[in-house]
Amino acid sequence: MTYLSQLEALLFVAGEEGLSLRQLASLLELTPTALQQQLDKLSQKYKEDKESGLCLIESSRTYKLVTKECLAPLLKDYAKAPINQTLSRASLEVLSIVAYKQPITRIEIDEIRGVNSSGALSKLVAFGLVQEAGKKEVIGRPNLYATTDYFLDYMGINHLEELVDISSIAVEEQETTLF
């Protein structure tokens, strides 16, 4: 596995929060100079690859993989898609996690699901079901996410307390799988 592929994978999994030079250097066990060379190489790879929809950016001393600017109209159309489209299984999982664990960071959602949740979370934000709800007071200050009033309307409830108690569901499932 090359440093370039490892770097790309880390930036993909980090999603919109990105990773700092220090975090990347530590994870890849590279000097800042060697890491900068790999970042430059990855950036150049995306610039030259007309078939790729991604590019590497540095924002607030954080590196992120983002979509190329020329794709903005297409992505805006996608984001405007009506909510009456069915939500994907991934989006429903993320929405459930946010509803029951809010406020929660994307990384915490990823840890619960075991996979990257950036796309599903972005879609839920675009649909107005989830919103940023501040920053977590830890290193990196990641965004916190919570459900919106539209989520309550969409679910036909007035308060989060009206959501089904998941502990009772877990007990029922456990009882049915014992035999």
From Swiss-Prot:
The keyword Oxidoreductase does not apply. Keywords: Cell cycle, Cell division, Chromosome partition, Cytoplasm. GO terms for cellular component: cytoplasm. InterPro entries: ScpB_csome_segregation, WH-like_DNA-bd_sf, WH_DNA-bd_sf. This is Segregation and condensation protein B. It comes from the Bacteria. PANTHER family: SEGREGATION AND CONDENSATION PROTEIN B. Homodimer. Homodimerization may be required to stabilize the binding of ScpA to the Smc head domains. Component of a cohesin-like complex composed of ScpA, ScpB and the Smc homodimer, in which ScpA and ScpB bind to the head domain of Smc. The presence of the three proteins is required for the association of the complex with DNA. Transmembrane segments: none annotated. GO terms for biological process: cell division; chromosome separation; DNA replication. HAMAP family: ScpB. Participates in chromosomal partition during cell division. May act via the formation of a condensin-like complex containing Smc and ScpA that pull DNA away from mid-cell into both cell halves. NCBIfam families: SMC-Scp complex subunit ScpB. Pfam families: SMC_ScpB (PF04079). Belongs to the ScpB family. It is found in: Cytoplasm.
